[in-house]
């Protein structure tokens, strides 16, 4: 139909626009009905449709507004737009009459010259006249119907038969009109987008460091998918589901896609939150449709990513009734995936989650998710294989020491290593920008001084780069470099020019400080940067920690030969500031194990059960990061002695930690270090063998140890010392009695501050400077002074000694000595000293 264009510029009301649109819609439906009836007549007479005749007689099938009645439009408008029912009837009638006349006038202007259009205007009755006539017809029809019914009472025939036999032309016309309206309405049915269920392009060969997981998946999934006849002949039901769990970024989604690509079977990947719908029952229908599609594509794999979003625990964990229904529907659908109902073709479900404990217990039983596979944080060997696999398609220049990179990336998961490779590639790309930009420094002029501020002097880059932090090496390039490069090379680079672009080992080292591991973002620390070189003295304690933790991680086979398989626990206790936390960090670094540092009070929560959940979460994360060292600082706040005065919540926290340390859960590869100043306040059950069985007393350093500590501090901090500094004289000073390692660090720091004051503020004029001018005074005094001229002298140390006071008094030292004798550790210390000698 050629749509009639109306003069919509003359319309001033939204109601007018709405009525005109509905009139055109009615005309389209009438035209479609007439075309359909003409086509049926022509097929009955000639057997085929003659398109040429349709073009010649186009006006025969077109329905015009002059053929409509106001009453017909009134009924159609109320049926199609329910909002018009709120409009007053009189206003609607007048609007329809006015708009119908406008449309007829538009038709007359456009089609009046065509011979097929009958331009003889018939006088149209108004809508009020039509409604009055219709009411009269209804009243007359009612009277006639009553007369017919009363006339049949004297006859033997039934009333229903008599009524059925009557042929009311008005009723038939209404039925035909409704039928044509239904047929002529062009209903646009929303078609579902057919998703691609073909196997992914990836394969298991592209994955590295996951050999154990791949072997389990091929046994549980690959064998039933490729050879279901083995299970059918033996009558063994193959597994219906496998649950993959582990920290974010460890490769759960990647291995599911790679497995489907390796097996070359249809793969239905679903993001679990996409199943949830706002309408009641729609979410369950989506799950049923997904499983019906899976059965039609069998054998196939169905992958639910983040499945914990739709399967929470129903015992209070599910907040709404809809979540309970979704869990129940998923359980029912998985139970129906038997070999009999899938025609001997298995359908296996793979679920992925970061929180397996939040899933409903019914989902984790046998027959649903039969097996659970934990994807741990990769160790050093796994990281080496992952880096090699990720670098297969990279253009690498020279030999890259991936083994060293694997050592430098403890706590990194696959996603973190991918980010490292990408950042290294970014460094290489920026290098070619700087190489081809060829920017040279030019003299500064008054007109281009603003541009010169952005230019780079390549000759100075070598000296300046050594002073910058490597974390800033991959900062965005200056705009002038990019502009100059684009100006010099507007066309794509040639192959010869691109041959210089490659990724070097230095690019990886530059990119490494910029990558923050996922574990550190979630609040779990990785391996610290403290080594034994940063620890002064404490030789006896270092030896014990090396035998208890470092060597079992580095060389576990030696301990297994003598029957030692369970990891040990160590309690470090002593006065504050003696290096307990520093020792724990150094142990984690030396063993190259993952490190989780927990401040005792931070796990405590005022809500019931939250503290226990936090403890379980720490050990769950540690199991996924084996080998791992958990360091509990201020342990006495977390596990106080249980007695009648202890609250019930604190007792539950102690019990939870005790069961995690030596309960039914496997603690293989998890080493625990506790630190406290008050070992007498810790519950005795924590100190029994199997938990924190080794207690090491970190006492105040003696004279030789103090000398070693202060030398280590000045060396590690890079403190510039004068030749007259005599550390032995400083240590022998009576004011250094009872000094701990923290006190000695404060002494070195205070002496450095005094050296700065002596260099910058030699006079007392600074006291008269106003507060708001203090920064300016400092800048004026520091002009022309370099850092190399600042030297810490012996007088600075003597002045600092007068300010620093020991953190442990004589009374506190005697208390710790008595506590050491009370715990019976003196003999152990003597034995350790003899072993050292």
Swiss-Prot record:
Encoding gene per record: RIX7
Comp. bias intervals (Acidic residues): 43-56, 449-461
Pfam families, A to Z: AAA (PF00004), AAA_lid_3 (PF17862)
Additional notes on this entry: Present with 4490 molecules/cell in log phase SD medium.
Protein name listed in UniProt: Ribosome biogenesis ATPase RIX7
Keywords, in A-Z order: ATP-binding, Nucleotide-binding, Nucleus, Phosphoprotein, Repeat, Ribosome biogenesis
Bias (Polar residues) ranges: 149-163
Chain residues that bind ATP: 246-253, 574-581
């Amino acid at each position: 139909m050629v749509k009639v264009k109306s003069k919509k510029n003359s319309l001033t009301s939204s109601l007018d626009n709405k009525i005109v649109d509905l009139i055109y819609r009615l005309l389209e439906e009438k035209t479609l009905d007439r075309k359909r009836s003409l086509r049926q007549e022509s097929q009955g007479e000639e057997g085929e449709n003659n398109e040429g005749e349709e073009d010649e007689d186009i006006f025969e099938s077109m329905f015009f507004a002059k053929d409509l009645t106001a009453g017909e439009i009134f009924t159609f408008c109320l049926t199609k737009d329910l909002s018009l029912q709120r409009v007053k009837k009189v206003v609607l009638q007048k609007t329809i009459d006015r708009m119908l006349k406008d449309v007829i006038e538009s038709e007359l202007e456009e089609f009046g010259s065509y011979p097929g259009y009958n331009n003889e205007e018939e006088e149209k009755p108004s809508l009020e006249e039509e409604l009055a006539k219709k009411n009269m017809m209804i009243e007359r029809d009612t009277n006639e119907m009553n007369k017919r019914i009363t006339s049949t009472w004297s006859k033997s025939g039934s009333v229903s038969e008599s009524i059925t036999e009557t042929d009311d032309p008005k009723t038939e016309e209404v039925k035909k009109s409704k039928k044509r309206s239904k047929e002529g309405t062009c209903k646009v049915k929303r078609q579902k987008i057919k998703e691609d269920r073909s196997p992914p392009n990836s394969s298991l060969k592209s994955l590295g460091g996951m050999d154990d997981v791949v072997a389990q998946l091929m046994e549980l999934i690959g064998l039933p998918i490729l050879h279901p006849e083995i299970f059918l002949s033996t009558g063994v039901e193959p597994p219906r589901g496998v649950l993959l769990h582990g920290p974010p970024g460890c490769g759960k989604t990647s291995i599911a896609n790679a497995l489907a690509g390796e097996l070359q079977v249809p793969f239905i990947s679903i993001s679990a939150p996409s199943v949830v719908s706002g309408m009641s029952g729609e979410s369950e229908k989506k799950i049923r449709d997904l499983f019906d599609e899976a059965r039609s594509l069998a054998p196939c794999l169905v992958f639910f990513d983040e499945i914990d979003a739709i399967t929470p625990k129903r015992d209070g964990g599910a907040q709404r009734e809809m979540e309970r229904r979704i869990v129940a529907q998923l359980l029912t659908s998985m139970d129906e995936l038997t070999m009999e109902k899938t025609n001997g073709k298995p359908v296996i479900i793979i679920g992925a989650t970061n929180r397996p404990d939040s899933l409903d217990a019914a989902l984790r039983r046998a027959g649903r998710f039969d097996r659970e596979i934990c994807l741990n944080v990769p160790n050093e060997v796994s990281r080496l294989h992952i880096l090699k696999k990720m670098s297969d398609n990279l253009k690498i220049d020279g030999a890259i020491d991936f083994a060293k990179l694997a050592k430098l990336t403890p706590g990194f998961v696959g996603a973190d290593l991918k980010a490292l490779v990408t950042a290294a590639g970014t460094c290489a790309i920026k290098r070619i920008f700087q190489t081809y930009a060829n920017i040279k420094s030019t003299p500064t002029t008054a007109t281009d001084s603003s541009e010169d501020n952005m230019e780079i002097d390549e000759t100075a880059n070598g000296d300046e780069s050594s002073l910058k932090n490597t974390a800033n090496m991959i900062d965005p390039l200056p705009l002038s470099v990019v502009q100059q490069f684009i100006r010099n090379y507007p066309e794509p680079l040639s192959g010869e020019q691109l041959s210089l672009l490659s990724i070097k080992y230095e690019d990886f080292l530059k990119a490494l400080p910029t990558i923050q591991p996922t574990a550190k973002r979630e609040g779990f620390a990785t391996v610290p940067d403290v080594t034994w070189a940063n620890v002064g003295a404490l030789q006896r304690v270092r030896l014990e920690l090396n035998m208890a933790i470092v060597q079992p991680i580095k060389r576990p086979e030696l301990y297994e030969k003598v029957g030692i398989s369970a990891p040990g626990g160590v309690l470090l206790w002593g006065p504050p500031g003696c290096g307990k936390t520093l020792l724990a960090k150094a142990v984690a670094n030396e063993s190259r194990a993952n490190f989780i540092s927990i401040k005792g009070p931070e796990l405590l929560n005022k809500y019931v059960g939250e503290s226990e959940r936090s403890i379980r979460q720490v050990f769950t994360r540690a199991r996924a990061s084996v080998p791992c060292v958990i360091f509990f600082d201020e342990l006495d706040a977390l596990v106080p002695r249980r007695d009648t005065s202890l609250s019930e919540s604190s007792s539950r926290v102690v019990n939870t930690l005790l069961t995690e340390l030596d309960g039914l859960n496997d603690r293989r590869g998890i080493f625990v270090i506790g630190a406290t100043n008050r070992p007498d306040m810790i519950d005795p059950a924590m100190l029994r063998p199997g938990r924190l069985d080794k207690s090491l007393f970190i006492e105040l350093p003696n004279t030789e140890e103090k000398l070693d500590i202060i030398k280590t501090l000045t060396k590690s901090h890079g403190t510039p010392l004068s030749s007259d500094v005599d550390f032995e004289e400083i240590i022998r000073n009576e004011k250094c009695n009872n000094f701990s390692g923290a006190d000695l660090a404060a002494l070195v720091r205070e002496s450095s501050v005094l050296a700065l004051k002596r260099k910058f503020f030699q006079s007392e004029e600074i006291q008269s400077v106003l507060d708001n001018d203090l920064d300016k005074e400092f800048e004026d005094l520091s002009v022309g002074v370099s850092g190399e001229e600042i030297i810490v002298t012996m007088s600075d140390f003597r002045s600092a000694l007068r300010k620093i006071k020991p953190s442990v008094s004589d009374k506190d030292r005697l208390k710790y000595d008595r506590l050491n004798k009370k715990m019976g550790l003196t003999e152990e210390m003597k034995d350790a000293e003899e072993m050292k000698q």
